[in-house]
Amino acid sequence: MKYDFKSVEKFYQDKWDFSVSKSGKQEKCYVLEMFPYPSGKIHMGHLRNYAIGDVIARYKRANGFEVLHPIGWDAFGLPAENAARDNNISPETWTKENIDNMRTQLKSIGLSYNWERELSTCEPDYYKHEQKFFLDFLKHGLAYRKESWVNWDPVDQTVLANEQVVDGKGWRSGAVVEKRKLSQWFLKITDFAEDLLKCLQSLKNWPEKVKTMQERWIGKSEGATIEFEVVGLNKKLKVFTTYPHTLFGASFCAVAAEHPIVQDLKNGSSVVIPVLDTGIQEIKSKRENDEKIGVYTGLNVKHPFLDKELPLYIANFVLMEYGEGAIFGCPAHDQRDFEFAQKYNLPIIPVISSAHLGVIPARDQNSYNGSQCQATQMTKEAYTGDGTMFNSEFLNGLMVSEAKEAIVKKFEEKKIGKKTINYRLHDWGVSRQRYWGCPIPIIYCKDCGTVPVPEKDLPVVLPIDVEFTSGGNPLDKHPTWKFVDCPKCGKQAERETDTFDTFFESSWYFAAFCSEDKSIDKDACNRFMPVDYYIGGIEHAILHLLYSRFFCRALTKCGYFDIKEPFSTLITQGMVCHATYKDENGKWLFPAEAKELIARGAKVQVGKVEKMSKSKKNTVDPNFIIEKYGADTARLFVLSDTPPEKDMEWSDDGVEGCSRYVNKLWRMVMQLRPVNIHYDNENVTGGLLEYRKKIHKLLHGLTDDLENCRLNCVVAKFREMTNLIAEIDVKTGKSLIDEGICILIRVIEPFIPHLAESLWQEIGGQPWPKADESLLVDDTVTIAVQINGKLRTTIKVAINLPQEELKKIAIDSVSSKIDQSKVRTVYAVPNKIVNIVI
């Protein structure tokens, strides 16, 4: 008789209902996996992600929690527009068809979702709420519009947030990002920068790596702002620095290519420099981490304390987004400045003494001049360590930390600067020049200016009749949609045609799941939030997770609920990896193709194991595995062997092994029927007692593993339990076998639920089992037996055995190795060791 997984799995998938109770009497547990983009097909990464979450949800449900475990679709985004353009199909149709396909696939995995709470971010019933949030953000000063330099993706033809630029390229298209000046809507995430930073320490159940990444992105810097006078202009150049103590070593100043002073130069309001435009274009083409290049502006600035001028450059390593978009360069103590100074033959003036540069005698410090300092150009790098200040007038002799305080105090006395805290984090630009996104609820009127759409007119819904025949935003070209009467004066006005960044939708969806109508219901949110277990990839550490933390603070400020942190425990699951294959011509092969070629004797290049990806074809279709082996086998494999947070390597043999285990377990229970759920094994002794102890110790251990998300350890323990039960003699230990099976079937359910549920029909359902505490305590102990301090054997004896009895048993255990008449003395430490001295 063979286990018919197909009929069993379909039966229970059709039967299961995991709706959320409305009573609110049970303790809640909110389990959520990061919701998917509806690409049309799930991959192995999805399967692993959702299986991890489902184990936690099922385990918590078995322990009496009211579990919220919803699913939805992150449905807006550029791929839908590309598909519309390529296939002559509307983004809405493409998206909804994909959702239907993926819903079917997810249900085939047997996930215990609250399907009644399913949502899709492209539905007006969903995004009408975020349009209202935006209007409330405006009222509370958390949203504003300004003209600013933005990151422009020339391929996707849209603006990117700083977080969406990776190594100077668009995170999705891979195109080199350009700088453009556009009017954009921003959210004031910087209002919460300090709180976002401080509260990272309260997230005890977040991976340290994620917290470190966010800490670095927020980028708190303590330093000073200094004003330099621009020679020949009635202007001041404001500079932020974290190294104010090195000011006496400054040999130049530099600004970003987008700095306002550069625009003044280009407009001819001050100095005309023929090569300026060419130089700026070259600078813009070079990223921050490229070779350090610059162009001299023809301007100089006055040193605040010395009678000298510093040349002003435009440089590629100065970022407009950081500080004031301007720096002073001290080449001796900053590596970027050092490389720049070497390229443009600028003085390198050390002001911190160290073994690296050589200590300047105190008597010579004040006479140490720039020309002498230039001799230090023999050094190959800047010195950035601690030391004593010299060649710095009133700072001479001070340690670096003292010098920082002293010079800032001097800035404040002279009213040329002050102590400043700066953040790398900048306000979130949310305007995108795309159609398939949530419309920004703003109207522009020539007479009234910027007018919010009245709340009664929400949602502002996307038009369906748009064309994708050319680039850019179709909403800009729509003949009717963007034209609307002004809500204030009634005259003709125009809608905002930009849509929200799609991270806007994913920054609050977890709160929408709390209520049945997908709104932000304060009581429902305060009941279920924060999410107790949030599962997803570490690639979302900065973008999605940081924005979500900001949104909770913003919504709390606007009175929607009282939650600052959205996610209590964050599990960043690793990737699913597979070997890569190429044929003789270097063409990528699917694993099945490679297997077939190898079987035919053809040459196949086997590459390294990498993350599964479409481009390298090293993928395995979850649907194929589910069809061939069943959902339980697929789930078990992605949860076995590897901790959730680590990358796992695909193995066909591993899948086969999981399939064999599922079938073995089914056969074992079938052969041992009927199973008596009213077993009584309180009085078992001897070998059966030892088996019972082992079963309960495994139960205790795997329960602890589940509490701590060591899911691979749970699998190892219930497989060990299966083997133990199979060893028990059915003639003498049937009652213990029954107990073991009842425990085993219950603990496998979160992992292989279809099989477990079908077997429960034989034994009856029950709550999560609890280990018998009395069986967890050993009544025996292993003792080391030494002869003259050297280990000879070990003995197992009763705990707290009297010392004389312990000595006798120890001597008997080594009787073949010693002459007992020569024993001089015996030292015994109960429960630990015996040493026989001869």
From Swiss-Prot:
GO biological process assignments: leucyl-tRNA aminoacylation
Positions of short motif 'KMSKS' region: 611-615
EC number: 6.1.1.4
Gene Ontology molecular function: any one: aminoacyl-tRNA deacylase activity
Residues at which ATP binds: 614
Enzyme class label: ligase
Motif ('HIGH' region): 36-46
GO CC field: cytosol
Family affiliation: Belongs to the class-I aminoacyl-tRNA synthetase family.
Name of this protein: Leucine--tRNA ligase
Species per Swiss-Prot/TrEMBL record: Wolbachia pipientis wMel
